């Protein structure tokens, strides 16, 4: 989109809510969060205690909350302070077998503190942003391309804190962040509802088929 008065290329999206104007600013991720690698506790500490965020929690949830974290670990003095994850923090996949998957991100949306593992990098919030906007932003094709080029490795690909901190993205005001995120959340909710309906209909079809053909089950 161009400004006809000055022939200046404006840094604005092609599709936008009408109440917003002005350019999106380019920021490195380090302006919004500080990065840290996760903890590597002994195996005997697993299975009890504080919830422990792993790569699977990043990949398998729309967002991460305390109750859907799979693993637990017994923490020792200083672990919560050093490796604690709080509401709005972003979690990144540090290592992957494929370059395309390295640096995938999710957001923690819970008031209960958790900790995170060694194959995860935490982006600790240090500036005001709308957490779910960053969840969607970091999954966008543009962001993924910028993150992937920071990955390195041969058989196994990794991304580091320094690489993530230098990823630069176009960021709107927090008011526009919230508006965009709520639209995407609404769409995700509709998708989840439709998927439940599809699952029920498929179950109904299986039940009808079983009832229709049960009497022929012993025939050859």
Predicted regions: what they are:
Residues 3, 40, 78-79, 109, ...:
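Short, solvent-exposed loop/turn positions at domain surfaces
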Residues 6-11, 17-27, 134, 168-207:
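Amphipathic alpha-helical segments
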Residues 9, 13, 40, 113-119, ...:
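A short glycine-rich beta-alpha junction/loop motif
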Residues 14-39, 166, 219-220:
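Non-catalytic DNA-recognition/assembly elements of restriction-modification systems
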Residues 30-42, 57-89:
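Sequence-specific dsDNA recognition surfaces
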Residues 59-71, 90-116, 132-136, 145-149:
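Short, ligand-facing micro-motifs at secondary-structure edges
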């Amino acid at each position: 989109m161009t400004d006809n008065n000055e022939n200046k290329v404006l840094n604005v999206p092609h599709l936008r809510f009408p109440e917003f104007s002005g350019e999106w600013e380019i920021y490195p991720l380090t302006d919004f969060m500080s990065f840290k690698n996760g903890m590597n506790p002994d195996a005997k500490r697993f299975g009890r205690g504080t919830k422990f965020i792993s790569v699977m929690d990043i990949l398998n949830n729309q967002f991460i909350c305390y109750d859907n974290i799979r693993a637990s670990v017994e923490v020792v003095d200083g672990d919560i302070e050093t490796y604690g994850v709080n509401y709005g923090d972003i979690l990144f996949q540090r290592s992957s077998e494929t370059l395309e998957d390295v640096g995938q991100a999710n957001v923690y949306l819970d008031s209960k503190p958790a900790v995170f593992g060694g194959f995860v990098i935490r982006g600790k919030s240090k500036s005001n942003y709308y957490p779910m906007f960053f969840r969607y932003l970091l999954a966008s094709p543009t962001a993924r391309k910028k993150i992937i080029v920071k990955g390195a490795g041969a058989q196994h690909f990794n991304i580091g804190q320094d690489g993530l901190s230098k990823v630069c993205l176009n960021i709107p005001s927090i008011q526009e962040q919230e508006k965009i995120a709520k639209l995407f959340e609404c769409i995700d909710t509709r998708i989840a509802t439709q998927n439940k309906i599809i699952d029920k209909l498929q179950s109904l079809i299986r039940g009808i088929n079983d009832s229709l053909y049960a009497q022929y089950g012993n025939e050859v």
